[in-house]
Regions:
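Non-catalytic cap/lid and distal C-terminal segments of serine-dependent acyl enzymes
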Residues: 1-240
Length: 240
């Protein structure tokens, strides 16, 4: 028997409508919620459903419901994931509340969030701006270079969050523009991620920083995903 079940819902509110796919344990009531941004990348290109189902099948892994939130397309990604306050509010309120209503066993507000590239930036932004709802984030090659490393330079005065941060040793490009919005990247992913990790540690957050072999690619993100989620969610649930 499969250890998990995948459902599909639509969440509407604050001017947004997003498809959300839910992956939850079959035999245990979930006590933790993890939002996965960039659902299309994680499900269609990384194979996250099988990887996470293997985690859920282990008794040692905290029973968790994973909510994969659609990004629609690249234009929406560039708008929504650039620390957009309205979209962050939609995730923290409408999406979390809709999932929590379906799983009454979810304990409190110590949720987590996971993303890659721009959605990795959005994941960190969500944790720092909604600390009462989120306890930590997994940020795979997060785009912390965005807007002159704005998030690194504007840390809220709080501590105690969990961050799994990773980046490839080949992510050294700088001085480039990203389509379709022309978003400008002046510093490398590698340098920006390292500086964000250092700042988070200075602010007394618990940080695990990994530099993997490779570039800005799906394959290494997929390879490290189970370990990233296991570390993050176990860290959070052990404190609950």
């Amino acid at each position: 028997m499969s250890s998990s079940a995948l459902d599909q819902i639509l969440v509407t509110g604050s001017g947004y409508t997003r498809e959300v796919r839910l992956l939850s344990p079959e035999k245990r009531d979930p006590v933790h919620l993890c939002l996965i941004l960039d659902a299309e990348f994680y499900l269609d290109r990384i194979g996250a459903e099988a990887k996470i189902s293997s985690l859920l099948a282990r008794d040692s892994f905290p029973p968790t419901v994973f909510a994969f939130v659609s990004h629609i397309d690249n234009a929406h990604r560039h708008r929504d994931y650039a620390c957009d306050s309205r979209y962050s509010a939609f995730l923290a309120n409408e999406v979390v509340d809709e999932v929590a209503n379906r799983f009454p066993s979810l304990a409190g507000n110590r949720h987590s969030v996971c993303g890659l590239s721009l959605s990795g930036l959005a994941a960190a932004c969500l944790v720092l701006h909604y600390p009462r709802r989120f306890a930590g984030a997994a940020c795979q090659s997060g785009s912390f270079w965005w807007n002159g490393e704005w998030l690194t330079g504007n840390f809220p005065d709080l501590s105690g969050k969990r961050f799994y941060l990773s980046v490839g040793n080949g992510e050294t490009q700088a001085g480039i523009s990203h389509q379709p919005s022309g978003m400008r990247q002046e510093v490398s992913q590698l340098d920006a991620c390292r500086r964000f990790a250092e700042k988070a540690a200075q602010m007394s957050h618990r940080v695990r920083f990994e530099v993997f072999e490779g570039g800005h690619e799906m394959e290494p993100w997929g390879e490290e995903l189970p370990e990233a989620l296991e570390w993050l969610i176990t860290e959070i649930c052990d404190l609950s």
